[in-house]
């Protein structure tokens, strides 16, 4: 009887620990210093299995005017998700220009495409960003987190 009670208590504790850990494993939240970067789509070119979207916007944090090109590749059978690569060019009022390599994954729900991107800038800065593309409104909005 004593072993049965201990076994039951042990299984209950194990179940609670598992449920606690599984909830935190499924959640992915980024915290820390960040800034907003907002863009307007200037063109959208469709190809079989991919789309190329160009956009531009003014971004703080010393970036200035930013031009983006993203090539979205469809990798799912339903066409609702995939990966992307891209390039960014920035120029500030003083004429300093920077280049960036962009890469990540995306998923679409209705008119909204959610992007998760890792970017490498020529000045050595690396950023993680989560973005939302509104295909109907023609906008891109990112929360950018510099990586230390």
How would you describe each model-predicted region?
Residues 25-148:
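Beta-strand-enriched cores of mature, soluble protein domains
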């Amino acid at each position: 009887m004593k072993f049965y009670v201990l076994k039951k208590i042990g299984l209950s504790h194990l179940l609670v620990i598992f449920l606690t850990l599984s909830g935190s494993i499924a959640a992915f939240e980024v915290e820390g210093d960040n800034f907003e970067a907002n863009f307007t789509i200037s063109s959208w070119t469709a190809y079989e299995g991919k789309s190329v979207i160009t956009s531009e916007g003014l971004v703080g944090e010393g970036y200035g005017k930013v031009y983006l090109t993203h090539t979205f590749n469809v990798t799912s059978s339903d066409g609702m998700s995939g990966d992307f690569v891209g390039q960014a060019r920035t120029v500030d009022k003083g004429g300093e220009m920077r280049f960036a390599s962009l890469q990540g994954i995306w998923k679409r729900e209705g008119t909204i495409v959610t992007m998760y991107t890792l970017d490498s800038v020529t000045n050595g800065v690396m950023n993680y960003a989560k973005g939302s593309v509104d295909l109907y409104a023609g906008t891109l909005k990112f929360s950018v987190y510099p990586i230390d």
